[in-house]
Structure formats: structure tokens, C-alpha cells
């Protein structure tokens, strides 16, 4: 499990809002130039589809979600403390019945 906080970072004040406010995140920039987003996904009635441009590792901080990566036909369940990886130039579908906190590690 990763640390509960990030030190020595810059946080972009303007939020990233997706799907009418069902997903809201903030970009965090590190001294070495890497970026992550810290976000929340509210309960969904249907899966939310996100496209990736760079590889991403989604770390679940609290809650649980069902995820389909790329063309997968099966959903996989992820809970707090777990992560899933999505290749660059791909997509994933995510749904949750509860508030989901996450860190998206942009790895490209």
C-alpha cells in the first residue's frame, strides 16, 4: 500500500469534471515531472467509459468498483488497497455502487 500523502507537489486548482460530475479529479504534479490525478467517482447507474492516452495504474483508495479493460467481456472487482492497469491508447469501463476514491498514476 502506498503512503497516505504526497509531499513536495504542485496541485492544479481547476478540477477535471467528467460525466456531469460523476467523476471529479485534480492533477498533482511531482518535482520529477510525473503526474497523478486524485479523484472521486460517485455511484453510477451504468458504466463510465474512459479512454487512455498513456498507460495508467488506477489505485483504489476507498470503496469498490467493477472494471472492464479494453475489449474484455468480463468485469473484475477491485477494492480499497488494490490497483488495476490500463494500457495506453486503450479504454476501460468502471462502475460503482458507492463513493470511490482513487489515485490514477499516469505512467507514460
From Swiss-Prot:
<comment type="function">
    <text>Catalyzes the phosphorolysis of diverse nucleosides, yielding D-ribose 1-phosphate and the respective free bases. Can use uridine, adenosine, guanosine, cytidine, thymidine, inosine and xanthosine as substrates. Also catalyzes the reverse reactions.</text>
</comment>
<keyword id="KW-0808">Transferase</keyword>
<dbReference type="GO" id="GO:0047975">
    <property type="term" value="F:guanosine phosphorylase activity"/>
</dbReference>
<dbReference type="InterPro" id="IPR011051">
    <property type="entry name" value="RmlC_Cupin_sf"/>
</dbReference>
<dbReference type="GO" id="GO:0005829">
    <property type="term" value="C:cytosol"/>
</dbReference>
<dbReference type="InterPro" id="IPR009664">
    <property type="entry name" value="Ppnp"/>
</dbReference>
<dbReference type="GO" id="GO:0004850">
    <property type="term" value="F:uridine phosphorylase activity"/>
</dbReference>
<dbReference type="GO" id="GO:0004731">
    <property type="term" value="F:purine-nucleoside phosphorylase activity"/>
</dbReference>
<dbReference type="GO" id="GO:0009032">
    <property type="term" value="F:thymidine phosphorylase activity"/>
</dbReference>
<keyword id="KW-0328">Glycosyltransferase</keyword>
<comment type="similarity">
    <text>Belongs to the nucleoside phosphorylase PpnP family.</text>
</comment>
<dbReference type="InterPro" id="IPR014710">
    <property type="entry name" value="RmlC-like_jellyroll"/>
</dbReference>
<protein>
    <recommendedName>
        <fullName>Pyrimidine/purine nucleoside phosphorylase</fullName>
        <ecNumber>2.4.2.1</ecNumber>
        <ecNumber>2.4.2.2</ecNumber>
    </recommendedName>
</protein>
<dbReference type="Pfam" id="PF06865">
    <property type="entry name" value="Ppnp"/>
</dbReference>
